[in-house]
Every structure is written in structure tokens, then in C-alpha cells.
């Protein structure tokens, strides 16, 4: 029987963080690094828990080099060859602790990932990424990967509800990717009518994961540093960004010049562009669930990184969190009808 859940679900745009008394004198006092010990792999990781999405325009080796200099993480896209990985491991061994090998849930994906992890044993993270993490097939795939790689930390998703977070953690995943349809180049919600407002999804999924000593990634929906702060405030352990890291020198693709403006291509991994590039086209039984856009060229990603980290430190000082770990404990969200003054855009 159809039913309606009448409880209000909110997105980042529906709330602001309430400022609170603070003993911090400066943003420079805020510690953004976190240390995690993962439930199933038993591995420990330290770093700033912001992840570049495993999309083939942004999840590049070039991006990983810059991110690792800030102790930030990159989920490298799944379309690099074994030789590409070997070359990267030889030239940038210092980056390998801050990257994940990405994989779909097919047999070919598993074989390819296995070859890479065998050739580059320093990589300890696996990102299992499918659009719909609710399928029985995916749960079984997570169990299989856990049995093959007992000491690797597994990220798996995407889902948006507590019961599926619990299922995937109990099946062997350590970190669950949360988000269905919030991405800047995702059209799942308009094509399928399926989705969940990201802020509420993060709050509910974090509660379920933390009860089992698991972790979550808020994946998608961030448009500015304030949204990243809200995701952490809602209980996300990691925040994954795609659109905010698009358009940079380190992104894949050439710079396009049009009408005197420099642009770079950015597209969703279920878009026509991605499926034509990697699967020879959109299969008859599928619909494209992603956009292809030309974004303004932003130069080196370094400035964007500093902007995001600076915003996050400032959030922590406003709410009295000396460490990023404390942000969710200090966060009180207020519902609003407007985010900011739009007189000048």
C-alpha cells in the first residue's frame, strides 16, 4: 500500500547553524584533522575528512597529489588502467595513504580492482560505488569484497536510510556513502522521482552508523563551504565533493575557450557523456540520470581548498568547536526561509 511519511525532511538550504559562545581566540586554533579507527578493517586513518568524488572529471591522480598535501582524500575514479596506477604509485608514493580504488559491482570491476590492489598494496581503501545501494546484489558484493580484502577499509553506497546503512555495515563495509540525487550534475530525482533531502539523510544515517561503530560520508548536495560545515554538523564523518572541485587545472579534460571565457567539462557518471565514453552509449533499458555542463575554469584547486578549509575553521569558531570532531556536538540548526542577502547576487 502506498503511504506518506509526513515528517518534515530538510536540505542544507533549509537551515543555518546557530552561533554559540566560544573560548576560541582565532580560526587558527581549530584542528580540522580527525583520526578514525574503522569497524571492520580495524585500520586507522588520520587526515582532514574531505573527499574528492570518484567522478572521472574530478577524481584524478593530479587532484590526489594536491589533496594529499593537505591530508585530504581522493576517491580515484575507476577508469584508470593498472599501468596508470603503477606509474602513479612509483611517482607519488606519499599520496597512496590518502586515496581509494573505486569499483562498481560487476565481475569485471572486481577483477580490475583486485589487480590494482595486488600491484599497489600500499592502497588500503576501496570505494564500492553504485547509484542504488539498496539491491540485494550489492549487499552480496560488499560481503564478497570484504571476504577477499579483510584488512582494507571499504566505502560503500549510495543509500539514504538508516536500515540500509546498518545492513551494509553488518555486511562488511566500514564507511557508508549517503546521498541519492543531491549532486549538482545528478538528475535522478527528476528522472525517477526518488531521493531524500540530504541534511535529514545525513542526520538519520549518522545515527544508525555510529550505533554500530561505523562511519558515513555525506556525498553530494554541497554548493559552498557553509554546506560542507552543515554536513559535518549533521553528523557526517566525511564529506564528498564533486561539483565544488570541478573546473580546476587538476580536473580531467582540456580547457575550452568560448566567447573569450575559459571553461571545463563536468558531467555526472550516469550522464549520456559518461555512458558514451565508457559503455559505448546509453543502453536501451536505461535513461541518462546525469547532466553534462561546462563550468568556468577556476585555475589551480589550491585556492578552492583553502576557501573550504577556511570556511570550516570559521564555522567551528562561531559554534565553539575547537576540533572538527566537536562540530556535531556543538551544532544547533535553525530552520530559515532565506540563506543570505541576494541584493548583489
Curated annotation (Swiss-Prot):
Binding of GMP, residues: 219-221, 242-243, 268-270, 286-290
User: Which Gene3D superfamilies does the annotation name?
Assistant: Aldolase class I
Task: Name the residues that bind NADP(+).
Answer: 26-27, 78, 129-131, 180-181, 269, 285-286, 314-317
Q: Which residues form the signal peptide?
A: none
Q: Which residues carry this modification: Phosphoserine?
A: 28
**GO cellular component labels:** GMP reductase complex
List the catalysed reactions: IMP + NH4(+) + NADP(+) = GMP + NADPH + 2 H(+)
EC numbers, comma separated:
1.7.1.7
Q: Which Pfam families match?
A: IMPDH (PF00478)
- Please tell me whether the keyword Transmembrane helix is annotated for this protein: no
A GO molecular-function annotation: GMP reductase activity
Spell out the SMART domains in the cross-references: IMPDH (SM01240)
Q: Which UniProt keywords apply?
A: Metal-binding, NADP, Oxidoreductase, Phosphoprotein, Potassium, Purine metabolism
- Give residues annotated as binding K(+): 181, 183, 186, 189
Per its database record, what is this protein's job?
Answer: Catalyzes the irreversible NADPH-dependent deamination of GMP to IMP. It functions in the conversion of nucleobase, nucleoside and nucleotide derivatives of G to A nucleotides, and in maintaining the intracellular balance of A and G nucleotides.
Give the record's subunit note: Homotetramer.
Name it.
GMP reductase 1
Instruction: Supply the gene name.
Output: Gmpr
